[in-house]
Swiss-Prot record:
It comes from Alkalilimnicola ehrlichii (strain ATCC BAA-1101 / DSM 17681 / MLHE-1). It holds the Pfam family GrpE. The keyword Chaperone applies. Residues 1-21 have a biased composition (Basic and acidic residues). PANTHER family: GRPE PROTEIN, GRPE PROTEIN HOMOLOG, MITOCHONDRIAL. This is Protein GrpE. Keywords: Chaperone, Cytoplasm, Stress response. Belongs to the GrpE family. Residues 1-66 are annotated as: Disordered. NCBIfam families: PRK14139.1, PRK14140.1, PRK14150.1. Participates actively in the response to hyperosmotic and heat shock by preventing the aggregation of stress-denatured proteins, in association with DnaK and GrpE. It is the nucleotide exchange factor for DnaK and may function as a thermosensor. Unfolded proteins bind initially to DnaJ; upon interaction with the DnaJ-bound protein, DnaK hydrolyzes its bound ATP, resulting in the formation of a stable complex. GrpE releases ADP from DnaK; ATP binding to DnaK triggers the release of the substrate protein, thus completing the reaction cycle.
Amino acid sequence: MSDKQREAERQQSEDKAHSEAESAEAGQAPEAQAAEDGAESASGDSGDELTELQQALEEARARAEENWNECLRARAEMQNIQRRAQADVEKARKYAVEKIAGDLLGVKDSLEMGVKAAKEEGADPQKLLEGSELTLKMLSQVLERFNVQEIDPQGERFNPEHHEAVAAQPSHEHEPNTVLNVMQKGYALHDRVLRPAMVVVSQKAPEPPPSGSIDEQA
């Protein structure tokens, strides 16, 4: 083989290798571009997810702040309600007897006039009695308006919830534990006893001795 032939074969081999290299590079280029495009797409998706997460976080923070502010407002309102309720209770306790005190002023005025009249020279006892009875009637009316009832159990059966026995007397005419005498009236407010009535109650009297027993002893 001549030198020219060998040179031609070498040149042909180089051209073939160069052509194959170019073909390989051309085949790798789309793959590299696809990989680069995929990386860019993945990066874009990650960025979108991060943006969405940040937006969701901001919305959650805003809702949390709104809920906290509502909680603070509710607590402040509750404290105001408690203060108003406490003030109302204190006011009710302080002025609980305001109405009855106002009604009792008329009774006091009547008593003062009666005392003044009694001190005058030549005071008429009958008029003083009438004035006292009128004052007592006024007081009874005031008590009735406030649901204060008398406990006057004359002749009734003894009730330990409303009466207090201060003495007992034998009696043939009454059943045992009958109220014989009311020493002091009691009073009740609605169903609550303010003061029990002080009473004398009956007890069973001893049986009289059989008739004729004295004659037999004599």
